Amino acid sequence: MPNIKSAAKRVRQNKVRRLRNKSVRTRFRNVTKQLLKAIEINEEPEKVNELLRLSYSVLDKAAKKGVIHKRQASRRKSRLTAKVKAYLEARSAGSAQS
């Protein structure tokens, strides 16, 4: 327990910030998992693209709030985009051969 008034206040502030950051982090992790799951189960391309747009939005908001670094957000978006692009190309190649 802190002995100094300002240290006690910092503890309270850190608790609030930790909970806020945790909710933002949970949100972008869940959206990312939804996107990867949609790719895994061969979801419709429209649904996958919608989830990708949502992922972009959530990651950008997390970076804006300082929960993750902007380069980390950019890197995650890039990797998700590459996976979606590969999925869509494989899906279109599969339907073209049928």
From Swiss-Prot:
GO biological process: translation
Residue ranges crossing the lipid bilayer per the database entry: none
Database matches in HAMAP family: Ribosomal_bS20
GO molecular function terms noted in the UniProt entry: small ribosomal subunit rRNA binding; structural constituent of ribosome
GO cellular component, one term: small ribosomal subunit
Role played: Binds directly to 16S ribosomal RNA.
UniProt family annotation: Belongs to the bacterial ribosomal protein bS20 family.
Swiss-Prot/TrEMBL keywords: Ribonucleoprotein, Ribosomal protein, RNA-binding, rRNA-binding
SUPFAM superfamilies the record matches: Ribosomal protein S20
Full protein name: Small ribosomal subunit protein bS20
Pfam families tied to this protein: Ribosomal_S20p
Organism superkingdom: Bacteria
InterPro entries hit by this protein: Ribosomal_bS20, Ribosomal_bS20_sf
Protein species of origin: Kosmotoga olearia (strain ATCC BAA-1733 / DSM 21960 / TBF 19.5.1)
